[in-house]
């Protein structure tokens, strides 16, 4: 029996995709960015508030300065395929952290397949953060007896790159 099988606990899966638009000021631009994110994701985004006052920029603490939406499950996988297609199915190798997460940006949201240009929205850029997970990662977030994930169970950047190549056919540059 020289056949080696991987443990089912080591199987990597997509946990969530977070789309974020930071516009830097409140008002109509927040509504425009919110409509753009809703057009991309099909979900209603939530406003993100400023953590501190920046007098030079005219931003007050608690004022909405960005919008974000979190997508999970099968919708996240379908959306990620569209977002990667907008980037030409390539991801920079430096976009990965030591825990299997990665981020990238899109300069113009109209590059995403299925998104049409609307003059009332204009052209906006956005940031995308992708989180990968394994079975057993729930011990970090449960309410009782929280624990850290063991060192050998953490997703490395190389494992995340391999997952992307295998699941989405992406080239890592």
From Swiss-Prot:
It holds the Pfam family Ribosomal_L5. Signal peptide: none annotated. GO terms for molecular function: RNA binding; rRNA binding; structural constituent of ribosome; tRNA binding. SUPFAM superfamilies: RL5-like (SSF55282). GO terms for cellular component: cytosolic large ribosomal subunit. Belongs to the universal ribosomal protein uL5 family. This is one of the proteins that bind and probably mediate the attachment of the 5S RNA into the large ribosomal subunit, where it forms part of the central protuberance. In the 70S ribosome it contacts protein S13 of the 30S subunit (bridge B1b), connecting the 2 subunits; this bridge is implicated in subunit movement. May contact the P site tRNA; the 5S rRNA and some of its associated proteins might help stabilize positioning of ribosome-bound tRNAs. Part of the 50S ribosomal subunit; contacts the 5S rRNA and probably tRNA. Forms a bridge to the 30S subunit in the 70S ribosome. This is Large ribosomal subunit protein uL5. It comes from Nitrosopumilus maritimus (strain SCM1). The lineage of its organism: Archaea, Nitrososphaerota, Nitrososphaeria, Nitrosopumilales, Nitrosopumilaceae. The gene is rpl5.
